[in-house]
Every structure is written in structure tokens, then in C-alpha cells.
Amino acid sequence: MTMTDPIADMLTRIRNAQSVYHKQVEIPASKLKRELVDILKREGYINDFEYIDDNKQGILRIELKYSDNDEQVISGLKRISKPGLRVYAKKDEIPRVLGGLGIAVVSTSSGLLTDREARDQGIGGEILCYIW
């Protein structure tokens, strides 16, 4: 069976693993997912990730992050642009998530960027998801 929205599947796997306090979660890999997970690591939402080559498409093993008193670092993940309804924003229309406390992941001509990076570079694109 084919997957219609691999990004939504990845976000759901992370959300489900965090809700039951798993230390790590494995998801099928792709270039886009790798870039998205790299943003999560750079922004401090996950500890680390590694790519495992299984001679097929590969697997991304994501090490989830919790605070000292076992609270989830990621409190919310929301898919914005979906296969049935794409959402685009110009450079001056890129949204702020929770007044700047969260991030919006934007797919641009320069690759995946956070909302801040896209605003700084002055480029718009497709709003993939919100993370807070």
C-alpha cells in the first residue's frame, strides 16, 4: 500500500512515540525527511538522529528529547500543507508560530528552512508544518 503523505506519517510517528515516552523512533527515510529531522535537531527539539542503510530506502532513527523532569520537549506538531491542499506563503506572509516560540518549516528553492531563516533570506515557499 502506498503512503499518500509521508511527512504527516513521520510527524504522527514522532507524536505517538513521545506520548508514550519512547527514547527513540524509527521512520522510513527520504531526503525531505532527513532535512526535516536535521532542522528538528538544529532547533533543539530532538537529541540526535542517524541514517541506517537497509539496502532499500533506509531508516531514520530519531532519538527523542525530554526535559529533566520527563516533560516532552515537542508539545505539538501540525501538518499545514497537505497533498490535497497546498499552502504557500510569500516572503512577507510567512507565519510566526506561537509568537515566535515555535517554528514553521518552509520548503523553499534553497531547501527546507525555518520561518526565521526564510524571513532572513527574504524567500517564501510551501509551509510544511508547525512545531512547538
Curated annotation (Swiss-Prot):
One of the primary rRNA binding proteins, it binds directly to 16S rRNA central domain where it helps coordinate assembly of the platform of the 30S subunit. Pfam families: Ribosomal_S8 (PF00410). Belongs to the universal ribosomal protein uS8 family. Keywords: Ribonucleoprotein, Ribosomal protein, RNA-binding, rRNA-binding. InterPro entries: Ribosomal_uS8 (IPR000630), Ribosomal_uS8_CS (IPR047863), Ribosomal_uS8_sf (IPR035987). This is Small ribosomal subunit protein uS8. GO terms for biological process: translation. NCBIfam families: PRK00136.1. SUPFAM superfamilies: Ribosomal protein S8. GO terms for molecular function: rRNA binding; structural constituent of ribosome. GO terms for cellular component: ribonucleoprotein complex; ribosome. It comes from Natranaerobius thermophilus (strain ATCC BAA-1301 / DSM 18059 / JW/NM-WN-LF). Part of the 30S ribosomal subunit. Contacts proteins S5 and S12. It comes from the Bacteria.
